[in-house]
């Protein structure tokens, strides 16, 4: 995959600063993509740990999750736009596999953006996991497993199928893609998600 330049990456990551509304606050995904749940409406957040807009969006989505409807299933998927994003994607799937997302997900965001720590390579991520109580050998085993490789490659493919051009982005039931750049604010983004959920119930 061709590496994205710094200036283009900045444009791709641009979220809250875009205030001009599109005609619709979401885009249709054609063809519709499968979801992991047959019985619930899936809401999927696509993110990158290195993205400041994703970090800013976290408290908004966490607050929204407090009142998650019973017929809605929320998932996260790391986005991958170039090779430098792969390590963070593998870190997410590793934490998920080890059952330590509660110890890793938000703290890693904080370490990168609030504490300004450099945690991008496998070794840096390993040290971070160890600091959160994860065995280093277990981390390395899972991080470099074929299962995690398959998962991050699948995430890359799905990002293309969703036609995502920046993060954070939210996919509703495999049919709609929305983001703060389309809605104008994080508050409007959550409102749009709610509206799309209602739309899917009909």
Language-model-detected regions and their locations in the chain:
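Sec/Tat-exported extracytoplasmic proteins
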Residues: 50, 65-68, 95-99, 112-116, ...
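Extracytoplasmic thiol/disulfide redox context detector
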Residues: 3-86, 156, 160-161, 195-202
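C-terminal cap of thioredoxin/glutaredoxin-like
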Residues: 5, 131-202
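Alpha-helix N-cap/helix-start motif
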Residues: 54, 84-85, 118, 182, ...
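Periplasmic c-type cytochrome electron-transfer domains
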Residues: 23-28, 117, 122, 192
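Structural microenvironment flanking redox-active thiols in thiol-disulfide oxidoreductases
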Residues: 67-97, 103-130
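Extracytoplasmic/secreted envelope proteins and their assembly/folding machinery
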Residues: 58-65, 88-92, 105, 122, ...
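Solvent-exposed loop/turn segments at secondary-structure junctions
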Residues: 50-53, 80-84, 110-114, 148, ...
């Amino acid at each position: 995959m061709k590496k994205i330049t710094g200036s283009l990456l900045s444009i791709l990551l641009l979220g809250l600063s875009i205030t001009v509304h599109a005609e619709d606050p979401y885009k249709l995904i054609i063809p519709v993509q499968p979801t992991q749940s047959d019985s619930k409406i899936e809401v999927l957040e696509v993110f990158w740990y290195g993205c400041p807009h994703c970090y800013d969006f976290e408290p908004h989505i966490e607050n929204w999750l407090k009142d998650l409807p019973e017929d809605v299933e929320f998932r996260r998927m790391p986005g991958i736009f170039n090779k430098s994003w792969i390590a963070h994607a593998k870190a997410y799937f590793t934490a998920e596999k080890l059952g330590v997302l509660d110890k890793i997900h938000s703290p890693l965001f904080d370490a990168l953006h609030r504490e300004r720590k450099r945690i991008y390579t496998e070794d840096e991520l390993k040290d971070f996991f160890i600091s959160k109580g994860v065995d280093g050998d277990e981390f390395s085993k899972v991080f470099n497993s074929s299962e995690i490789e398959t998962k991050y490659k699948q995430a890359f493919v799905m990002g293309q199928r969703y036609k995502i051009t920046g993060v954070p982005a939210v996919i509703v039931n495999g049919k709609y893609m929305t983001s703060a750049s389309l809605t104008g604010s994080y508050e409007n983004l959550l409102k749009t998600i709610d509206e799309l959920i209602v739309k899917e119930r009909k």
